[in-house]
Curated annotation (Swiss-Prot):
GO terms for biological process: pseudouridine synthesis; rRNA processing. The lineage of its organism: Archaea, Methanobacteriati, Methanobacteriota, Thermococci, Thermococcales. HAMAP family: Nop10 (MF_00803). GO terms for cellular component: ribonucleoprotein complex. Involved in ribosome biogenesis; more specifically in 18S rRNA pseudouridylation and in cleavage of pre-rRNA. Transmembrane segments: none annotated. GO terms for molecular function: snoRNA binding. It comes from Thermococcus kodakarensis (strain ATCC BAA-918 / JCM 12380 / KOD1). This is Ribosome biogenesis protein Nop10. InterPro entries: H/ACA_rnp_Nop10, H/ACA_rnp_Nop10_sf, Nop10_arc-typ. Belongs to the NOP10 family.
Amino acid sequence: MHFRIRKCPNCGRYTLKEVCPVCGSETKVAHPPRFSPEDPYGEYRRRLKRELLGIGRRS
């Protein structure tokens, strides 16, 4: 499935274009990524996030 609607991170406008027609900045996909309970890369993504934020693992 290909999502078409996009959102400008600067002015908050929604558009179908890759560049915001109002402020000219690059738009981002407005939809969150799909969730899967069997996420094969979830452990690695969480580990990287903890390392980048300097958060220790709770015991």
